[in-house]
């Protein structure tokens, strides 16, 4: 007889005040270490070790902790073996019986919803609970107050499962990651490097247009000068001999040739400018794909609306998701919404001079939430660090407006809610 699926639809845990939590999501750990995952392995392991010193603590891994869509036969075991500090910190944290480790199933690690071997590995290694949603019930003098944790992909039609326990249920987003993107990357190579890390997946067309504009058209346009220079040289040498033979003075001949060649030069340049303008218009009009591609194109707006609905019609005081990779803490009427961000590379659009098409640059993001519950208030801090990866061409760097490139590890925002 098959073992019962240990993944709960909604895991509920009750805690007293004086409880501390760390919440993170979308770190996408795989079998191969990246610069972003190395950052995660180092920094989050430190935070978990610090949390282990508290009397009663909870680590909420709020979905897409593991990258089980991409890579060659990806597994939780391979990902954790490649990130030993992270693995060790969770093992040490789990040794305190008062501590809890909770894995909320996301879409990229959706296999945790049905894969028995990977479920059991997490349960046995970390004594972890696995669920599709986690509800934290806080006992207060005014009664129970609850906070709901979900990954958030159910609000994104392209990445939502109809039955998350069915191994044959594969959303459209999984097809893109496993089939479409690899084919595009293989065919185009370096031209579209970073497309799989787009911060705004629905900007796919604009990203490709930008790369073609800067890395193909503009970067090679200097080659058009060669025939112009050759033409000018030939016309000057041959033309001078013709005018001299006809009896014109050298001064007059030189003046006529210069005026003629300047006119020819600017005529050619005019044609080139006209062609460039037409190409620019075509590229700049590359349409953003429909907003339902990616996290509905609206970042956390749907999650914020759900948070307000939960607060209005239930006993919830807060709702926390991930999925969009957009960290956020927002005060709502009688409660809050928060997004735990990510720990990955994100390729983001940047403004340019002369209203040229936007360029794209890679940045390594790391975000997490720290929650402190005391007798009267619920405190939540958003920690973040951002490091820019210099992966632009010289031309892109010259035409990109300067902006804040990096951010040291710091508390980005704080919020308190009365219990």
What spans do the regions from the language model cover?
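Extended recognition/assembly regions associated with phosphoester-bond processing machinery
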Residues: 1-419
């Amino acid at each position: 007889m098959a073992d019962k699926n240990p993944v709960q639809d909604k895991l509920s845990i009750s805690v007293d005040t004086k409880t501390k939590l760390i919440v993170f999501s979308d770190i996408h750990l795989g079998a191969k270490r990246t610069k972003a995952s190395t950052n995660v392995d180092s920094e989050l392991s430190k935070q978990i070790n610090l949390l282990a010193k508290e009397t009663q603590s909870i680590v909420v891994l709020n979905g897409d902790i593991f990258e089980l869509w991409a890579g060659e036969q990806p597994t939780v075991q391979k990902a954790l073996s490649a990130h030993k500090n992270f693995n060790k910190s969770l093992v040490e944290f789990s040794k305190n019986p008062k501590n809890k480790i909770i894995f909320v199933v996301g879409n990229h690690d959706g296999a945790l919803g049905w894969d028995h071997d990977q479920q059991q590995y997490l349960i046995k290694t970390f004594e972890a609970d696995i669920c599709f949603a986690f509800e934290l019930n806080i006992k207060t003098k005014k009664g129970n107050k609850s906070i709901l944790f979900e990954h958030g992909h159910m609000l994104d039609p392209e990445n939502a499962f109809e039955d998350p326990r069915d191994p044959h249920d594969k959303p459209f987003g999984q097809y893109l990651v496993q089939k479409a993107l690899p084919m595009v990357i293989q065919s185009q190579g370096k031209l579209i490097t970073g497309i799989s890390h787009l911060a705004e997946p629905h900007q796919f067309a604009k990203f490709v247009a930008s790369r073609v504009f800067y890395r193909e058209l503009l970067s090679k346009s200097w080659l058009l000068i060669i025939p112009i220079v050759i033409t000018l040289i030939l016309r000057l040498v041959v033309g001078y001999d013709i005018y001299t033979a006809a009896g014109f003075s050298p001064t007059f001949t030189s003046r006529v040739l210069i005026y003629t060649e300047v006119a020819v030069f600017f005529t050619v340049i005019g044609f080139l400018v006209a062609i460039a303008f037409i190409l620019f218009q075509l590229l700049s009009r590359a349409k953003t794909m429909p907003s339902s591609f990616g996290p509905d194109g609206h970042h956390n707006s749907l999650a914020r609306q759900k948070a307000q609905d939960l607060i209005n019609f239930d006993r919830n005081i807060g709702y926390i998701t991930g999925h969009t990779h957009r960290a956020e803490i927002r005060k709502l009427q009688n409660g809050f919404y928060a997004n735990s961000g990510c720990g990955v590379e994100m390729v983001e659009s940047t403004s340019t001079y002369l209203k040229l098409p936007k360029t794209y640059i890679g940045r390594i993001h790391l975000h997490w939430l720290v929650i402190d519950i005391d007798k009267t208030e619920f405190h939540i801090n958003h920690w973040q660090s951002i490091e820019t990866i210099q992966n632009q061409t010289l031309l892109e760097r010259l035409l990109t407006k300067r902006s804040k490139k990096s951010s040291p590890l710091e508390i980005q925002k704080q919020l308190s809610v009365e219990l």
